[in-house]
Structures are given as structure tokens and as C-alpha cells.
């Protein structure tokens, strides 16, 4: 390779015929590509995120079962200190949202305080009941969803 050709290939300004703006656009495009490669975006559909969270929750429940069998105590007074985020429950069967057995397994406080459709949690908190094929409790992202998105996923929101 000749020295002139090597310099031309190393300096992208000489390759751009349209002047400064074309080079800047090219540089911005290259920066964007490099950032995407360095920081891959997680663009999974919401349904697959729910499945990942379901799987993690099932594994957590399996680890907690031996602990629950050792100390079958009723919910304590400190369980009233729920976070201000949305509380959620799901059922593994096709039972009604207020079937007490599955809810009690997931969150004793909910089954203790929420006995019928008219009941509310302290502070007017919402409860989202999820109808999914497996016992699960998604947390961390549901509270960021808007009501239409939640309904699209088949979640029931109680006021």
C-alpha cells in the first residue's frame, strides 16, 4: 500500500465529499453503533419479562417452603408496614380472586385483610390480582405500568 492511500484510509475527513456535516453525521452514527454494542438494550416483550419474574418467584417460594413449615405463625403487626408500591397476587388455578387458600400461601396479610371485593387495604392501596398459569408474584415493574397496559396483560386491578 502506498503512503498516500494509507493516510486517506486513516483520515475519514478525506473520504467525505459533502464537507463537515456529513462527517459529523457519520461520526454520530458510529458513536450510536458503538454505544449499542457496549450497552445492549434489553428490548424483551413484557410477557417474557413476566415469565422471568414468575420463574424467580417460584424458585424463591420453593426455598421458603421449609421455613414456612417450621413456624406457622399468624401475620404480625409489623406486616401492616407494607411499602407504598402495588401489592400483587396470582393464583395457579382458575379460582375467583378472593379464594383465600392460594392468596394466604402467597401473602398472608392480603388474605387476612382482603376478604371480599369491597374490602380495601389500609391507605387505599391497590391490589392487582394476576391470572397466570403458575403461582407467581411479579414485583418491581408492575407499579410502573399504566392501567390499560395492566389490563392488556390480563391483570385485574381492584380499587
From Swiss-Prot:
Q: Where is this region: Disordered?
A: 63-88
Q: Which cysteines are joined by disulfide bonds?
A: none
Which residue intervals define the domain IQ in the entry?
47-67
What segments bear the compositional bias annotation Low complexity? 76-87
Q: What is this protein called?
A: IQ domain-containing protein J
Amino acid at each position: 500500500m502506498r503512503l498516500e492511500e494509507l493516510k486517506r484510509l486513516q483520515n475519514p475527513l478525506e473520504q467525505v465529499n459533502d464537507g463537515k456535516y456529513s462527517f459529523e453525521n457519520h461520526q454520530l452514527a458510529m458513536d450510536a453503533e458503538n454505544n449499542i454494542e457496549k450497552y445492549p438494550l434489553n428490548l424483551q416483550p413484557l410477557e417474557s419479562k413476566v415469565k422471568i419474574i414468575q420463574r424467580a418467584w417460584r424458585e424463591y417460594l420453593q426455598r421458603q417452603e421449609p421455613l414456612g413449615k417450621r413456624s406457622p405463625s399468624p401475620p404480625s403487626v409489623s406486616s401492616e408496614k407494607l411499602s407504598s408500591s402495588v401489592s400483587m397476587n396470582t393464583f395457579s388455578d382458575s379460582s375467583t380472586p378472593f379464594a383465600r387458600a392460594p392468596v394466604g400461601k402467597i401473602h398472608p396479610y392480603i388474605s387476612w385483610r382482603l376478604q371480599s371485593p369491597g374490602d380495601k387495604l389500609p391507605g387505599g392501596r391497590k391490589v392487582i390480582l394476576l391470572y397466570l398459569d403458575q403461582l407467581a408474584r411479579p414485583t418491581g415493574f408492575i407499579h410502573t405500568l399504566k392501567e390499560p397496559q395492566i389490563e392488556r396483560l390480563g391483570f385485574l386491578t381492584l380499587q
